[in-house]
Amino acid sequence: MVTVGTFNQLQVVKEVDFGVYLDGDDLDTILLPKRYVPEGCEIGDWVSVFLYFDSDDLLIATTETPKVEVGSCEMLTVVDINHAGAFMDWGLPKDLLVPYNEQQKPMEVGYSYLVYVFHDQQSDRIAASTKLSHHLDETPVWLKPRQAVNLQIAGRTDLGYKAIIDDKYLGLIFRADAYRPLKIGERLPGFVKAVRDDGKIDLLISQATLQGDHDL
């Protein structure tokens, strides 16, 4: 299945002066501009490309690697603001929009924010949001105590730190379980400490902490 906002392996089906067209399956053919076409590329070859919407809102392919893909979170910097919202540098020619209704608080140019990137099906565009709890599940039923996970620090609370689990869920690291100050956006390995009665997840950030807690 071909998905927008991620890397896809697509086959070259047509050559033109300004690039090549790729078979996008149900998305029709997709242009890979000439400057991104690998040397020696021919009809029938397969290429790894990232799909996004250009400044004319046309679906286009690139071999450039963005800083984040759809379905993931990352710290990005605001480079512009206009009537539509804030625009962030994500490593591609067209900046990434954070609409005003997806901003937890007003964003400012030059500041970096942790955002979740998604494909807005209603507007058919790639967008980002600082309202992480609107997009990430806080009560995943398939996480179990002592399960290894990848964490990204999302923010501070009175109890400790909110953390993103595997780019999909939200959990909590209690301050007592954080053996050092943690930075928003920081990525680190962790473990599920416990699943609360309400289904929310408590986390640990090191094997040593987990072992010490178990020994107690």
Question: Residue ranges of each PLM-predicted region?
Answer:
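Single-stranded RNA-binding regions, centering on S1/OB-family and related RNA-binding modules
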Residues: 1-216
